[in-house]
Design a protein with these regions (language model features):
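Carbohydrate-active catalytic/glycan-binding domains of CAZyme proteins
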Residues: 1-130
Length: 130
């Protein structure tokens, strides 16, 4: 295998658009990478009770992808909150990694669709917030 391979690092940045087609990007980072992380991806933001809630994927090469969580009062400055992260199962199709969550509400119940091991090759599942 390769040793000390420099991998690209990806974070989540802020952009605005008046029409959803033309975007203004000023380079402002919304979520910073933590020490062992190499990538942040696929943010999904919902607003509940005036709080912006972001679910995003993060990659730590030692554990693979996980789904992280952050909150904001203005949609610009975000604070990561470890308590609300979705972890992996003990065994099965999502026991190695979970990623690319999409959160939505239906009949006042919050659901998350997400991919399992192998970026979803072993399955796609859902979680319900309790």
């Amino acid at each position: 295998g390769w040793i000390n391979k420099d991998l690209p690092k990806y974070n989540i940045k802020y952009a605005t658009s008046a029409d959803g087609y033309d975007w203004n990007r000023d380079g402002k980072v919304s979520i910073e990478l933590e020490e062992n992380e190499t990538a942040l991806a696929r943010p999904c933001v919902i607003i509940e009770n005036g709080i912006y809630k972001m679910y995003f994927s993060y990659k730590d090469p030692s554990i693979g992808y996980r789904i992280g969580y952050a909150e904001s009062t203005d949609g610009l400055s975000w604070t990561r909150i470890k308590l609300n992260e979705l972890g992996v199962s003990k065994v099965g199709w999502d026991s190695e990694m979970v990623e690319y969550g999409f959160v939505f509400k239906h009949n006042d119940v919050k659901f998350m669709l997400y991919n399992g091991n192998g970026y979803g090759m072993t399955g796609i599942g859902y979680a319900i917030e309790r």
